[in-house]
């Protein structure tokens, strides 16, 4: 029983129903969307789910009568806000990076997110990240009082292209020497049996996190650029992640900027990542300070901190990189014409230094109508910071009415 006396419903019984009737599918969609975005309005539910207002209203009314939904009208707003009633369940999102694993978790009936991250060495191999991720999930749920036995879904973002049809990894990030074969969800079965595991590229999930909870909220087309050790992107069109046929959508780091340029680990030459990847930026700082300073930054994060404190070399290297990224973004804009570009990853932690030179690069080659109109494409910093991927994984897994297995 809940504190109000109503019978508490297990969220899994609402989501894991076998019926594929139109009515039951729509019911699950509405429940999932309300869990993913607590307090969403009925108007937004219809828009996000591509359902009619009448269909959403009927489903919400039925769920309200059952005590599963609470519906409130707030002054000055269009549409009633929908929140869960006495429903018990936990949603989890995981992001695996080159140097860090992050986990976000929360109850499905609240927007309060618990978050934890840990250092992780990618050279530990492709087998350790599943174990470390599972351990971090368990630690976070214990520390915060969340019931691990009531997890309804786990979204997992990894630095790899993932085939959206099978959840199989098609290619790991060029900077990682990982051999990931087989089904990624299956790797989690020893730790979380019977829990749906929804796997995708970590930049895709970061894009979805900003779209659902952050800087991209309310935008129709959002391009998220993750600039850290490597460079990736995620594209949201009409609330959906664009992945492409084989999961390679968003590989902005491998746009060819110079056909005769530096060899890239992907096998090509002159990729954007060879010009603005973390290793290249650190090398430029080392070259600039050769013979002058020994206490050089060892990470992009360290470069950013020095630039913020006034280090002219770090600032110049970072701003030159931002301008180059802007040049590449002009190509993407000319093809996709996004409404909003969000800068995330490590470089997203210094918007005050990098957004302007990035926009300068974009303006050079983007079509005039996109940058000079009354409603130009905008570049903004991330609202969610380094938590974007884990939070997006959490939200997307809740929204997904399926488990993809190999």
Model-derived features: positions:
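Glycine-rich phosphate-binding loop of actin/hexokinase-like ATP-binding domains
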Residues: 219-276
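ATP-binding/phosphotransfer module of carbohydrate and carboxylate kinases, centering on a glycine-rich
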Residues: 1-76, 83-150, 260, 268, ...
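Short, acidic, Ser/Thr-enriched surface-loop or helix-capping motifs
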Residues: 107, 164, 236
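Short coil/turn connectors at secondary-structure junctions
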Residues: 87-89, 194-195, 217-222, 231, ...
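Hydrophobic "anchor" residues
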Residues: 112-113, 169, 241-242
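General beta-strand structural signal in soluble alpha/beta enzymes
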Residues: 71-72, 196-201, 235
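Glycine-rich phosphate-binding loop and adjoining helix at the ATP-binding site
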Residues: 116-221, 353-364
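Acidic-glycine-rich active-site phosphate/pyrophosphate-binding loop
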Residues: 184-186, 243, 250-257, 362-372
């Amino acid at each position: 029983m809940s504190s109000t006396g109503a019978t508490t419903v297990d969220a899994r019984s609402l989501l894991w129903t076998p019926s594929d009737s139109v009515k039951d599918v729509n019911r699950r969609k509405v429940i999932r969307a309300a869990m993913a975005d607590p307090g969403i309005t009925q108007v937004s539910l219809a828009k996000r789910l591509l359902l009619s207002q009448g269909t959403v209203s009927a489903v919400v009314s039925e769920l309200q009568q059952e005590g599963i939904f609470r519906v409130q009208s707030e002054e000055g707003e269009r549409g009633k806000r929908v929140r869960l009633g006495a429903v018990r369940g936990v949603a989890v999102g995981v992001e695996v990076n080159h140097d860090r694993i992050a986990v976000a978790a929360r109850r499905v009936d609240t927007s309060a997110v618990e978050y934890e991250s840990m250092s992780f060495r990618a050279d530990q191999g492709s087998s350790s990240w599943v174990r470390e991720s599972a351990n971090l999930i368990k630690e976070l749920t214990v520390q915060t009082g969340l019931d691990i036995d009531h997890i309804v879904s786990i979204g997992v973002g990894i630095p790899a292209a993932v085939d959206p049809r099978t959840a199989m990894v098609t290619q790991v990030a060029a900077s990682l020497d990982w051999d990931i074969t087989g089904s990624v969800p299956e790797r989690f079965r020893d730790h979380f049996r019977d829990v749906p595991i929804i796997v995708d590229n970590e930049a895709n999930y970061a894009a979805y996190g900003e779209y659902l909870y952050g800087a991209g909220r309310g935008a129709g087309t959002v391009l998220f650029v993750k600039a850290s050790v490597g460079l990736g992107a995620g594209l949201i069109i009409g609330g959906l992640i664009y992945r492409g046929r084989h999961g390679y959508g968003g590989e902005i780091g491998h746009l060819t900027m110079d056909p005769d340029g530096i060899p890239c680990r992907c096998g090509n030459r002159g990729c954007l990542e060879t010009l603005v990847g973390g290793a290249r930026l650190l090398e430029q700082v080392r070259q600039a300070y050769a013979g002058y300073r020994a206490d050089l930054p060892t990470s992009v994060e360290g470069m950013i901190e020095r630039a913020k404190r006034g280090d002219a070399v770090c600032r110049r290297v970072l701003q030159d990189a931002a301008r180059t990224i802007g040049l590449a973004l002009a190509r993407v804009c000319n093809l996709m014409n996004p409404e909003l570009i969000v800068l995330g990853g490590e470089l997203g932690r210094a918007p005050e230094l990098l957004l302007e030179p990035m926009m300068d690069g974009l303006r050079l080659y983007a079509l005039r109508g996109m940058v000079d109109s009354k409603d130009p494409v905008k570049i903004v910093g991330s609202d969610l910071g380094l938590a974007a991927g884990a939070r997006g994984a959490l939200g997307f897994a809740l929204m997904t009415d399926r488990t993809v297995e190999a």
